[in-house]
């Protein structure tokens, strides 16, 4: 009886000590079980939101204490973020979910100046953090003990197959269409190397990927949100803010012919974006996530220097790994191409595993090489891409007028859903006589606020956002006049 009991205990303990386990991120060779403890920053009696703006977690890795400082990524979703899927008869079903209180955070490790972190706190902690130069991943263990998490190095995730995975871009591309010259904007001295830029991102999921995840829209949404959170964090060193503007899931059938030849699929997707997607909602760059096996070892493709072009500001990426972070690196890689970046030359760039490496490395990096930064600076200087100058505004939605949907539609000067708004004529959806505006952070009593009036306090090193005196919208980063 005692022997049987001992065997039972060993079997129960083994998952906590094991050297191999199958996780969402793949089959992991070596991992450590940790129990993150949340350090509450809210005062006693305060009402706690579902996901706090700032959080701190403590746990141990290799016996050493690790303290994660996390902040909510407040710019991750546009104010009019939308999700679209399709009915069996082909009708579009578009919703505008509230995503203000989301669970996606970025941050750093205490007392590690070079550390970074990108963590989803939706159901436990899932994401990655850089600690003492090493990339670690963390995710909850599906055990009865709900506090248990697995922490493991990226290099300990087994490859799903032995074939090298690479980007299919082999040559440069230059648009025949000139990109509109940027207007002069105020830039602080600190922003001169990499001025603040904003990319409104549209993600389209093909039917193959939708069925891959059991035709479960919630699974797709969660995975895409995690990807975009990672992309945003990787683009931050370039002073680029990534904002998810829309998610379009081809739930019934593909709306283009998704082909094994990645450049062909990208071309068809670019045509569809120009013809259909941009007419529904303005955005700067679109990516097609697919489950198709591209020819050869290709997992992604994008036009070099295509950003802000209606047809060429696109990329196509295979959902090639169960590990969200790995796919997010590929998506960031294709955005890099659109921003003028070529592949890293291993002899010149001295970065074996940076984001723009042509082949995925066992030592996955989330950094852009100096070569990539130079390419990006050249692209900004020579092409002056206008579409990424400003943060997303409410008026980026384009659709037929529908009163009272809380968005400014084509043909409307104001949203006329509320008869209590004195600035908007409920019968015509036009501004009331004498009114300049009906709502917005720079609208006060139907008039534009004065130029220079603070409309959004600064976060981090950016300046306060101030009204222009010419609009009800609050521009990002004090870029006015």
Swiss-Prot record:
Ca(2+) binds at residues 200, 284, 387, 390. Its EC number is 3.4.24.-. SUPFAM superfamilies: Blood coagulation inhibitor (disintegrin) (SSF57552), Metalloproteases ('zincins'), catalytic domain (SSF55486). Expressed by the venom gland. Keywords: Calcium, Cell adhesion impairing toxin, Disulfide bond, Hemostasis impairing toxin, Hydrolase, Metal-binding, Metalloprotease, Platelet aggregation inhibiting toxin, Protease, Secreted, Signal, Toxin, Zinc, Zymogen. A motif (Cell attachment site) lies at residues 459-461. SMART domains: DISIN. CDD domains: ZnMc_adamalysin_II_like (cd04269). Zn(2+) binds at residues 333, 337, 343. Its cofactor is Zn(2+). The disintegrin belongs to the medium disintegrin subfamily. Belongs to the venom metalloproteinase (M12B) family. P-II subfamily. P-IIa sub-subfamily. This is Zinc metalloproteinase/disintegrin.
């Amino acid at each position: 009886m005692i022997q049987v009991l001992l065997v039972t205990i060993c079997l129960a303990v083994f998952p906590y000590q094991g050297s191999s386990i199958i996780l969402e991120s793949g089959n992991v060779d070596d991992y450590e079980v940790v129990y993150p403890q949340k350090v509450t920053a809210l005062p006693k009696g305060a009402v706690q939101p579902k996901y706090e703006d700032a959080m701190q977690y403590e746990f141990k890795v290799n016996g050493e204490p690790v303290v994660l400082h996390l902040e909510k990524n407040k710019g991750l979703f546009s104010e009019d973020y939308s999700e679209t899927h399709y009915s069996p008869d082909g009708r579009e079903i578009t919703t505008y979910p509230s995503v203000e209180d989301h669970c996606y955070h970025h941050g750093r490790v205490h007392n590690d100046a070079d550390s970074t972190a990108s963590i989803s706190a939706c159901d436990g902690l899932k994401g990655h953090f850089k600690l003492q130069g090493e990339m670690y991943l963390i995710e909850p263990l599906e055990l009865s003990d709900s506090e248990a998490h697995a922490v493991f190095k990226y290099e300990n995730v087994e490859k799903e197959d032995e074939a090298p995975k690479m980007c299919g871009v082999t040559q440069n591309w230059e648009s025949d269409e000139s990109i509109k010259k940027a207007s002069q904007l105020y830039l602080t001295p600190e922003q001169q190397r990499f001025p603040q830029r904003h990319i409104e991102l549209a993600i389209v999921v093909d039917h193959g990927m939708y069925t891959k995840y059991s035709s479960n829209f919630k699974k797709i949404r969660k995975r895409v949100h995690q990807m975009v959170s990672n992309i945003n964090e990787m683009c931050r060193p370039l002073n680029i803010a990534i904002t998810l503007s829309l998610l379009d899931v081809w739930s019934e059938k593909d709306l283009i012919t998704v082909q094994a030849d990645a450049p062909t699929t990208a071309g068809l997707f670019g045509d569809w974006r120009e013809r259909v997607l941009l007419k529904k909602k303005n955005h700067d760059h679109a990516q097609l996530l697919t489950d198709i096996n591209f020819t050869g070892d290709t997992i992604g493709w994008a036009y070099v220097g295509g950003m802000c072009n209606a047809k060429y500001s696109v990329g196509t990426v295979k959902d090639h790994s169960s590990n969200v972070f790995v796919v997010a690196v590929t998506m960031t890689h294709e955005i890099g191409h659109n921003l003028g970046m070529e592949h890293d030359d291993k002899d010149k760039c001295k970065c074996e595993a940076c984001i723009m490496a042509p082949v995925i490395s066992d030592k996955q990096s989330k950094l852009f090489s100096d070569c990539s930064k130079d390419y990006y600076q050249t692209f900004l200087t020579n092409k002056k891409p206008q579409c990424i100058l400003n943060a997303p505004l409410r008026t980026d939605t384009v659709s037929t007028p529908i009163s009272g949907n809380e968005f400014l539609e084509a043909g409307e000067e104001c949203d006329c859903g509320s008869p209590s708004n004195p600035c908007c004529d409920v019968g015509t959806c036009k501004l009331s006589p004498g009114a300049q505006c009906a709502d917005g952070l720079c609208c006060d009593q139907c008039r534009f606020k004065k130029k220079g009036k603070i409309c959004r306090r600064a976060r981090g090193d950016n300046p306060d956002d101030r009204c222009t005196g010419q609009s009800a919208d609050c521009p990002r980063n004090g870029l006015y006049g």
